[in-house]
Amino acid sequence: MLALVGNVCPEGPSVSNATTLVPPHTITSEAELDALYAAPTAPSVAKEIVRLNAPYRAMIEASPFCTLASIGPQGLDASPRGDGAGFVQVVDDWTLALPDRRGNNRIDTLRNVVRDPRVALLFLIPGCNETLRVNGRARISTDPDLLASFAVDGKAPVTVLVIAIDAVFFQCGRAVLRSGLWSPEAHVDRSTLPSAGAMLSARS
């Protein structure tokens, strides 16, 4: 039988006093999770630290791409960010700086940050199976000297996210290996996928 649970709405943002049906075999508590999964190994716990060390710094400096997740009143957002390797600057062992290059001006992430500073980053390095995860709190800076330090071809970013690190740890390469992400044999012919124009046309 289906159970009734309040304040859960799978079709969109949570609605006050909303009630929906929870499908059978749905996990609804941490106790149920703990009964299914073994405790993490000691190395899995020990790899998480609150500041950068030399290996973690090297990973960030080698990365040309990361995803940036944020949270706000309208929900969650995950945004791709990329540039030359090391485009996210290591200010010190506790701080990162990420330039906001000119784009489509949706600025979903920035709108979230001014309301809730919590962010999470996932760094990828081409050819490297391990990834690096950073959790922290961001602020949006328009400091002229900071903007100028990120100028490329004479063009400075509009703003820079300054991120205070709360936690940093590497993720093992299993997901990347299983997906064949860096394997040329797994690469998809772009012409077999819908173009940006086709996706825009199909939005309705």
Predicted regions and their residues:
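Binding-site signature for planar aromatic cofactors or substrates
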Residues: M1-S204
